[in-house]
Amino acid sequence: KAKQLETLKAAFAATPKPTRHIREQLAQETGLNMRVIQV
C-alpha cells in the first residue's frame, strides 16, 4: 500500500493532469482501479 502511494505521488508530481493512457499504466502498476486514480 505504501508503494502504491509512492508510485502515485511520483506520477502526479511528474504529470499533474495525467492522460488516460498514463492512468491506465498506473492502474496496472499499482493494481488499483482506474476510478481510484482520478484526481
From Swiss-Prot:
The keyword DNA-binding applies. GO terms for molecular function: DNA-binding transcription factor activity, RNA polymerase II-specific; RNA polymerase II transcription regulatory region sequence-specific DNA binding. One of its GO terms (cellular component) is nucleus. CDD domains: homeodomain. One of its GO terms (biological process) is neuron differentiation. It holds the Pfam family Homeodomain. Its main location: nucleus. Keywords: DNA-binding, Homeobox, Nucleus. It is found in: Nucleus. It comes from the Eukaryota. The keyword Nucleus applies. Residues 1-39 bind DNA. This is LIM/homeobox protein xLIM-2B. It comes from Xenopus laevis (African clawed frog).
